[in-house]
From Swiss-Prot:
This is DNA-directed RNA polymerase subunit beta'. It comes from Verminephrobacter eiseniae (strain EF01-2). GO terms for biological process: DNA-templated transcription. PANTHER family: DNA-DIRECTED RNA POLYMERASE, DNA-DIRECTED RNA POLYMERASE SUBUNIT BETA. SUPFAM superfamilies: beta and beta-prime subunits of DNA dependent RNA-polymerase. Belongs to the RNA polymerase beta' chain family. One of its GO terms (molecular function) is DNA-directed RNA polymerase activity. The lineage of its organism: Bacteria, Pseudomonadati, Pseudomonadota, Betaproteobacteria, Burkholderiales.
Length: 1411
């Protein structure tokens, strides 16, 4: 009986494994898998449709084609289970064994595995130390390889052609052995002595860098072979496994034809060629024929494994390349990405969505028909439980007939059973949320309007999918974690996601505006009820200014109880009525103003922080209901008269046209260049457009009214278009400008600006030419969008892949490290406040009050809104907080270092997949970023040219440590530092603002001077860069020769002449001469730099205009020459998506700047080949030198002292340099700031945390500098956690630990170099990853999320983390228990054995076994 029950038991996969290993199979292993050899290429008999014996579908090898029935029909039914039929040789069993039983083909000649040959770098080449070209020549029978030189002068592994071989045979006879084809390669592989080779290579890790690198790689492979017990000769196949037939099916189509898997074709070819070769070898055919057949067999095997990898791909009947085994697993439609990482699921449906304004936030409307289909199993079980149906079949009938009882049951089943709604593309975790279904008529799903922004849904035909969680656990998780009312914040920024938009905003805005002299102005009411009655009676209008007695509930500082306070408040009727829905604890002041979209968002945010989740959700729903109602009552509409065209427009356009004409004249006269004219014209029209739109907004936003005293006053306008834009409901000033102002300048498809603007607007209408110009932009926009979506999706995919295994795994890693945060200030403006940067982070050290040094925040406390308000009040301007980068958790992150979970508002939970959330937060807004790289041209260049800085606040002036200046003859202070900054401190000495000042600027303030806001701090010439002397003396020119190094330029208009430094074209002089000036003192000696014996030498760059004469006396701070900035090409600024990708891929920028390698003094050496030799000498006298191309802009000069990591050559910084010279914290700051700049430009808010998490993953590998007593090879890249574990073990054993340095990898590189080969293989370059993993015999510890999804287990995150931890703990306990029992048994047996037996022996076998 038991065996019968076993039969029906479901086959359960064993989920209790902790790692997966991949390796290479030996011929023995392949034979052991096999159930028989496939000898014939036939598949099935075309008449009987039965598989041919010994063929590719043979039932004897692979199993029966009908359940429990042999092929000839002798044995049928269950009773003969396991019998092997003597007639047809088929085992009687289930037919599904045809999915798992493999066969094999014995190859008549060995064949190399193409993956190990052609997947770069060639593994065969690495092991044999031969080039790929040579191995290929041997394998494909073009050359011989010496496998055993014997006593001859030949070298092993040497290659010889046919002719050479014949000659050598004549010379040496049979002394040596040389072979062709895979046999030769196999012999070579067999002859490798791995241990010996390893020893030899370990001793050989010296010499040239190339050789060391090569040896290190070879050593790694050989050590892997040794460790995993894989023999190198297995890379050459002798036995080919055959895939089970049901995995490469043959399906009869109607009309007697068959659809077949390409693999069958490929196998057929291999079998045909193999049998032919076997026959030839038996017949002892001539060598050349056998050789040709062997080559063909090798090619057939290659095509089967990876078609098209070498030579032309094998094609089928229809000229299409056949799909080989490798193609099955790689790419988007391969096994990994199509079937393992993403699957289609049952119990799901999709339909169009419509708006459900009456729903509560946690509800959605589900069409009855859909619900009936989705909840079928639940309905069936209910019908059976009620006894209405006895079998599933009967229940099915009942449901299909649709009797009333079925609908009643559906209502019952659906109660409190959440369903999940998903809108594609699911860019972040709010793209799938759970709702409680409400049954509705019709066929469209109803969606709550407030969740639209999270789904990015609208109702113009969008569709959504519904999924039903089946198990109780799944329902529970959907309800607690995914219910829409539990996800009210965006995980990217912590801002509310349930913010009203469009009509709701308009309604609330309209109701909270105030109107001068509205009906009922000045009335006083006893309470809001009275206001409501007056409003209903038509005695008072919503916008009328009135006074009401209101009761507010607020929490005092020290208690949690709500206390009422009542007061008379001056407000409007609309606001008073709206105050009724405020949750207790939210002050009325938040609604006592015109509610625009931003204000409503703040209102919800404050409500969430002050009143909690539940109150906020109820409040949001009430806001929604009121918004819709009020918008309907307001009846705002658009008429053409609302689009007011400003009367000043004609004048502005006329003036601009005059200016453009003037410029055209100047251009014709040759006073300005074509480029200048174009820039100026674009500039003029840009200004004109702005002026028109200013005039238009001024006119739209104000209107004149009579107040109740009969005076004419102006108030904010009630113009419909203005209200829509002002409230944030729809449209913006830029859009209104196109309707009622002027459309302005348009861009060509290549991004350059057309200089003829569109002066008309949409109200006046466009003429044909204007219309044509404007189509450019529209079309470019559409093309851009399509490209952008694909690129953005790919960036998200790379980000997810690099961070997928980062999970919060412990509470606190107890590190003392952190990062110092202060507000980001640029050009004197606070771009990101300290509050935004430290909110929700953990303090890494005590935060003290700046004045009385009291502890405001102790270590390890998370900074929430209240604490930050205290810090702001105390005026703290920098805080050291813990960050994801400094966290010391080995695998994953700790909760304290991560801080607040932005999507939930509290400290992050254990098991939260912070990596994936970071990737989603950065990738989701990707589609909003621009694709274009901006040219600084036209409209953009106006903002760039600055010529002075002003103080923004009152305070005391200070200079940064890098600031250096000299006083010139007029007593002005001239800056001679390249990176000097002016800092303004308030009276407590806290930094308020910081301004960069360029080289050569004149300072208009002194240190410690008190300044008022608006004071000019420094000014400079914007369009030229000066060369300044720091010392006094008389100039002495060197190499300044007219016609050779300088040219005299005459200014036509003014008649003045200047010397311009030119590039010496005459290559006659061996050394390149460089024009320079030295200074001579009164005695005629050269002026030396104080403290050195360098003389002061100031070089002139090409393009400099020399401002002094030879022999002129100059004072410090005087300008010797000026370099026009115009001469420098304006660099393209990479913006938007490409910039973000560039940063995360850690690419070295083109034209990168150079940072100083060490702290020291700058000097210039001899020039070579158009390059300048720049040297830095440190205090110990070590010299570092760098060759800099002439056209680069060098930021330092002779004798200047630079600090390590300071910029010495202009250009964008290379992240690798920043990491090497300045360390991890600086690098992180650089990447975070640069990425944030791109997003900030688009108005997207992302928390710094997310970017830090990605930088952490980019830094997760290190490079071994010195192996110490570990098994690493220097130069090897290792996972950081692994080397830390190794070093701990080494220290514990008293050995020398390995020394390593940080390594920054781009996200693609980092994903591919992860320890998990399953994750890497499913990302990109599947073949290469799997080849490498197989050779190394890699183990995948299944730590990440992706690996676990692929092997089909719960992921180790969220609720799954607890499951896995519990499972591992239980396994460990079971192990310990087992060990204890075994020990006890052994002890018992030993005790028995100690009793002397008859022959006097006392030791038994049990002792040996116990050991």
């Amino acid at each position: 009986m038991k065996s019968l029950l076993d039969l029906f038991k479901q086959f359960t996969p064993d989920e209790h494994f902790d790692a997966i290993r991949i390796g290479m199979a030996s011929p023995e292993k392949i034979r052991s898998w096999s159930f028989g050899e496939v000898k014939k290429p036939e598949t099935i008999n075309y008449r009987t449709f039965k598989p041919e014996r010994d063929g590719l579908f043979c039932a004897k090898i692979f199993g029966p084609i009908k359940d429990y029935e042999c092929l000839c029909g002798k044995y049928k039914r269950l009773k003969h289970r396991g019998v092997i039929c003597e007639k047809c040789g088929v085992e009687v069993t289930q037919t599904k064994v045809r999915r798992e039983r493999m066969g094999h083909i014995d190859l008549a000649a060995p064949c190399a595995h193409i993956w190990f040959l052609k997947s770069l770098p060639s593994r065969l080449g690495m092991v044999l130390d031969m080039t790929l070209r040579d191995i290929e020549r041997v394998l494909y029978f073009e050359a011989y390889v010496v496998t055993d030189p014997g006593m001859t002068a030949l070298k092993k592994l040497s290659i010889m052609s046919e002719e050479d071989y014949e000659a050598k045979r004549k010379e040496y006879g049979d002394e040596f052995i040389a072979k062709m084809g895979a046999e030769g390669i196999k012999d070579l592989l067999e002859s490798i002595d791995i241990d010996l080779s390893i020893e030899k290579l370990r001793g050989d890790l010296t010499g040239s860098e190339v050789k060391v690198k090569k040896n290190a790689k070879r050593l790694k492979v050989l050590e892997a072979f040794k460790k995993s017990g894989i023999k190198p000769e297995w890379m050459v196949l002798q036995v080919l496994p055959v895939l089970p037939p049901d995995l490469r099916p043959l399906v009869p189509l109607d009309g007697g034809r068959f659809a077949t898997s390409d693999l069958n074709d490929l196998y057929r070819r291999v079998i045909n060629r193999n049998s032919r070769l076997r026959r030839l070898l038996e017949l002892k055919a001539p060598e050349i024929i056998a050789r040709n057949e062997k080559r063909m067999l090798q090619e057939a095997v290659d095509s089967l494994l990876d078609n098209g990898r070498r030579g032309k791909a094998m094609t089928g009947a229809n000229k299409r390349a056949l799909k080989s085994l490798a193609d099955m697993i790689k790419g988007k439609s391969g096994r990994f990405r199509q079937n393992l990482l993403g699957k289609r699921v049952d119990y799901s449906g999709r339909s169009v969505i419509t708006v459900g304004p009456t729903l509560k936030l946690h509800q959605c409307g589900l069409p009855k028909l859909m619900a009936l289909e989705l909840f079928k199993p639940f309905i069936f079980s209910r019908l059976e439980a009620m006894g209405i149906a006895t079998t599933i079949k009967a229940a099915k009938k009942e449901v299909e007939s649709g009797t009333p009882v079925v609908w009643d049951i559906l209502e019952e089943v659906i109660k409190e059973h959440p369903v999940m709604l998903n809108r594609a593309p699911t860019l972040h975790r709010l793209g799938i949320q759970a709702f409680e279904p409400i049954l509705i008529e019709g066929k469209a799903i109803q969606l709550h309007p407030l969740v639209c922004s999270a789904f990015n849904a609208d109702f113009d035909g969008d569709q959504m999918a519904v999924h039903v969680p089946l198990s109780v656990e799944a329902q529970m998780e959907a309800r607690t974690l995914m219910l829409a009312s539990n996800n009210v914040l965006f995980p990217a920024s912590g801002e509310p996601s349930i913010v009203p938009s469009q009509d709701v905003v308009l309604g609330l805005y309209y109701a909270t505006r105030d109107r001068i002299n509205g009906k009922g102005e000045g009335l006083v009411f006893a309470d809001t009820g009275e206001v409501q009655r007056a409003f209903d009676a038509g005695e008072v209008e919503l916008a009328a200014r009135i006074t009401v007695r209101l009761t507010e509930w607020s929490k005092p500082k020290d208690s949690d109880a709500l206390v009422p306070t009542t007061a008379l408040v001056e407000t409007t009727a609309g606001r008073a009525l709206l105050s009724e829905i405020l949750p207790p604890g939210l002050p009325f002041s938040y609604v006592n103003k015109a509610l625009k979209k931003k204000e409503i968002s703040r209102l919800i945010n404050v409500s969430f922080r002050k009143c909690g989740l539940k109150a906020t959700v109820v409040f949001a729903d009430k806001l929604l209901q009121n918004g819709f109602r009020l918008a309907t009552r307001a009846g705002i509409s658009i008429a053409i008269d609302d689009m007011l065209v400003p009367p000043q427009k004609a004048g502005i356009i006329e003036r601009s046209e005059r200016e453009v004409k003037e410029f055209e004249q100047q251009y014709v006269s040759g006073l300005v260049t074509a480029g200048e004219r174009y820039n100026k014209v674009v500039d003029i029209w840009g200004k004109a457009g702005d002026e028109v739109s200013k005039a238009m907004m001024a006119q739209l936003s104000k209107e004149q009214v009579i107040d109740r005293h009969g005076q004419q006053v102006s108030q904010e306008s009630f113009n419909s278009i203005y209200m829509m834009a002002d409230s944030g409901a729809r449209g913006s000033a830029a859009q209104i400008r196109q309707v009622a102002g002027m459309r302005g300048l348009m861009a060509k498809p290549d991004g350059s600006i057309i200089e003829t603007p569109i002066t008309a607007n949409f109200r006046e209408g466009l003429n044909v030419l204007e219309y044509f110009i404007s189509t450019h932009g529209a079309r470019k926009g559409l093309a851009d969008t399509a490209l952008k979506t694909a690129n953005s999706g790919y960036l998200t995919r790379r980000l997810v892949d690099v961070t997928q295994d980062l999970v919060v795994t412990e509470e606190d890693c107890e590190t003392a490290n952190g990062s110092l945060m202060r507000a980001i200030v640029e050009g004197g403006e606070v771009i990101e406040s300290l509050r935004d940067r430290i909110l929700g982070r953990t303090a890494a050290e005590e935060v003290l009050h700046p004045e009385n040094r009291m502890v405001l925040v102790p270590v390890g406390v998370m900074l929430d809104e209240d604490l930050i308000e205290e810090l702001e009040a105390a005026g703290v301007d920098e805080v050291k907080v813990r960050t994801a980068l400094t966290c010391e958790t080995r695998y994953g992150l700790c909760a304290k270092c991560y801080g607040r979970d932005l999507g939930r508002g509290g400290l992050i939970n254990l098991g939260e997949a912070v990596g994936v959330i970071a990737a989603q937060s950065i990738g989701e807004p990707g589609t909003q970023l621009t694709m274009r790289t901006f040219h600084i041209g036209g409209a953009a260049s106006r903002a760039v040219i600055a010529s002075r800085v002003e103080a923004k606040s009152n305070g005391v002036i200070g200079f940064s440590s890098t600031m250096r200046y000299v006083s010139n003859t007029k007593g002005e202070l001239v800056v001679i530092a390249r990176s000097g900054e002016i800092v303004i401190h308030d009276e407590y000495g806290r930094e308020r603002e910081r301004h960069k000042v360029p080289y050569g600027a004149t300072l208009t303030v002194n240190a410690d001077q008190n300044v008022k806001a608006g004071t000019v701090l420094a000014k400079w010439e914007p369009l030229t860069r000066p060369i300044i002397t720091e010392f006094a003396g008389r100039t002495k020119f060197e190499n300044v020769e007219e016609g050779l190094t300088v040219a005299r330029q005459l200014d036509e208009v003014t008649g003045l002449s200047t010397l311009v430094v030119i590039d010496p074209k005459r290559r006659g002089a061996a050394k390149v001469v460089r024009p320079q000036v030295k200074l001579i003192d009164a005695q005629g000696n050269e002026v030396k730099i104080p403290g050195t014996d360098h003389s002061v030498t100031i070089g002139f760059q090409v393009g400099a205009l020399i401002q002094v004469r030879d022999g002129q006396d100059v004072g410090p701070g005087e300008v010797l020459a000026r370099i026009p900035v115009e001469g420098q090409k304006t660099r393209d600024i990479t913006g938007g998506l490409p910039r973000v990708a560039e940063l995360f891929e850690a690419r070295t920028p083109k034209d990168k700047g150079t940072l100083a390698e060490m702290t020291g003094t700058v000097s210039f050496g001899k020039e070579t080949k158009g390059k300048v030799r720049l040297q830095i000498t440190d205090p110990e006298g070590h010299v570092f030198e760098e060759l800099v191309p002439k056209e680069k802009n060098i930021l330092v000069h002779e004798g200047q002292v630079v600090n390590k990591g300071e910029s010495i050559v202009d250009g964008p910084a290379d992240p690798q340099d920043i990491l090497r010279l300045l360390g991890i914290e600086e690098l992180s700051r650089y990447i975070v700031d640069e990425v944030q700049d791109v997003y900030r430009l688009q108005g997207v808010k992302i928390n710094d945390k997310h970017i830090e998490v990605i930088v952490r993953q980019m830094l997760r590998r290190v490079v071994v500098e010195d192996a110490g007593e570990s098994n690493y090879i220097s130069g090897e890249q290792v996972e950081r956690s692994e080397i830390l574990n190794t070093n701990e073990a080494l220290r514990a054993a008293g050995k020398i630990p390995a020394v390593y340095s940080n390594l920054l990898l781009g996200i693609t590189k980092a994903s591919l170099s992860t320890d998990s080969f399953i994750s890497a293989a499913s990302f990109q370059e599947t073949t290469r990853v799997l080849t490498e993993a197989a050779i190394m015999g890699k183990r995948d510890e299944l730590r990440g999320l992706k690996e676990n999804v692929i092997v089909g287990r719960l992921i180790p995150a969220g609720t799954g983390l607890a499951y896995h931890q519990a499972r591992k703990a239980k396994d460990a306990m079971d192990d310990a228990e087992r060990r204890a029992i075994a020990d006890a048994e052994a002890a018992e047996m030993a005790a028995q054995a100690e009793v002397p037996e008859l022959d006097g022996s006392s030791v038994t076998a049990s002792d040996a076994a116990a050991d």
